[in-house]
Amino acid sequence: MDSATVYVGIDVAKEQLVVAVHPTQMCWETTNEQKAFPSLARRLLALRPTGIIVEATGRYHQPLARALAKAGLSVCIVNPRQVRQFAGAAGRLAKTDAIDAHVLARYGQALQPQPRGVRDAEAQQIQDLVARRRQLVRMRVAESNRLDGVSSVVAASGRRIIRTLDHEITSLDTAIDRALSAERWRDTAAIVASVPGIGPQSTRSLLTELPELGTLNAKEVAALVGVAPLNNDSGRFRGRRTTWGGRRDVRSTLYMATLSAVRYNPPIRAFYQHLVDAGKPKRVALIASLRKLVVLLNALVHQHRTWTLEVPRAA
């Protein structure tokens, strides 16, 4: 079969996979378990597909994606919202597992997304630790907010919960730092941490949730984070450019880092102040500074060098 024309879409559920092939309209089901992956990989390899398109489904797609990528197949993890928008534009309003699989295959054929998004088991474990830490921090904030105006008995209970959460957060920090001390992450961690404004938690988050850092150009990394300005023009109308999409957790991490960078990182501080002096709203200046910060980080990692006052050229 001509590999230039073949795309495979896989709809993933907890226990089941539905596989569709474009343009042959072939479709079949299999189980979503490790023992089924080798035979599925062999069947797909025989088709010589250009790409395997899988929606991000939390956890259920990850073992499948790793197994297929390890078998030598080109796997792309895609955003479910973008796929549903594509389905609507194509007039596919009905939704079944088989329809979803065919939509994924057609999405691949129409847009030809680049293979990206498959983490190995070790990287996924660290990312899970970072995500868990974020959950516990949010729980701690929620518990702290409940302490105001309650009885002493309830407040004491809340403080015990907070102490437990503090202990768990510290344990997670230790586990994450131990994992990131491995050789594959050590150099990148040192580069990221060298930038003024980037603290330990920002370093952990960027290494695990933005693994593409250093492999993309400036526009691509800004778009991946969701800080690439998008035009809003029509005819003679020229609308205000806005940012949209991207990885929310990474963007939140970088937002907090930028608040620090506009105070302690001289190039970022000068850039931010220049925009404010030019009349830009402070929030607009802050988002622009965030974009400059992530482009700077990307360039440093690409060039394998730590931060200095000399601003590196964007990758």
Indicate residue ranges for each PLM-predicted region:
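A detector of single, family-specific signature residues
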Residues: 1-315
